[in-house]
């Protein structure tokens, strides 16, 4: 696809008793969401320790792996991730799985490491909250997802996307 404005038209029968399911546009691109508008852009293949929804992945529901080179002094090494929005994080060092981070104290042992350079890989497992979730529900305290959570009205509804933070924050 060339850079510029494009229009994708999908026609389906729709009424108040039918819901539209999420549709996926797959490819090597990022998405910037500002209010109601979305713009596709080049993907960076890099992510900071910050909300992934603001880094080009507002609707992404898959896994994301952070690759972090580090130098060890040798000996027992632990990794802790106490500020994240994901179901679970898988930790690996130098290609060897070390364990999972999901519950307090949000820490996993990488084992005894030799002195020198190593590669830590933290795979943050995705979820579908920003793909299938209540993206127009303005109730920030809503923690239940069921049939009527998608049917908001009045001040609880917004045309602008209400994405939830994700990733290593």
Segment roles from a protein language model:
Residues 13-42, 125-169:
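Glycine/proline-rich low-complexity spacer/linker segments in large multi-domain proteins
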Residues 113, 122-123:
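Ligand-binding pocket scaffold of soluble enzyme catalytic domains
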Residues 2-4, 75, 109, 114-116:
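A glycine-anchored, Pro-Gly-centered beta-turn/N-cap motif
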Residues 6-12, 120, 147-148:
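Cysteine-clustered segments with highest specificity for TGF-beta superfamily mature ligands
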């Amino acid at each position: 696809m060339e850079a510029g404005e494009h229009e994708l038209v999908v026609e389906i029968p729709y009424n108040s008793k039918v819901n539209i399911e999420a549709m996926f546009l797959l490819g090597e691109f990022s998405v910037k969401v500002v209010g109601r508008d979305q713009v596709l852009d080049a993907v960076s293949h890099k992510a900071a320790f910050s909300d992934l929804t603001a880094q080009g992945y507002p609707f992404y529901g898959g896994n994301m792996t952070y690759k972090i080179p580090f130098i060890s002094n040798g000996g027992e090494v632990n990794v802790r991730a106490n500020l994240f929005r994901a179901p679970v994080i898988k930790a690996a060092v130098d290609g060897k799985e070390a364990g999972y981070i999901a519950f307090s104290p949000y820490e996993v042992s990488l084992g005894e490491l030799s002195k020198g350079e190593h590669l830590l890989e933290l795979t943050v497992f995705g979820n579908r909250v920003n793909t299938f979730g209540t993206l127009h529900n303005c109730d920030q305290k809503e923690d239940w997802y069921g049939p009527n959570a998608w049917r908001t009205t009045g001040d609880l509804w917004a045309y602008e996307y209400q994405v939830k933070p994700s990733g290593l924050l």
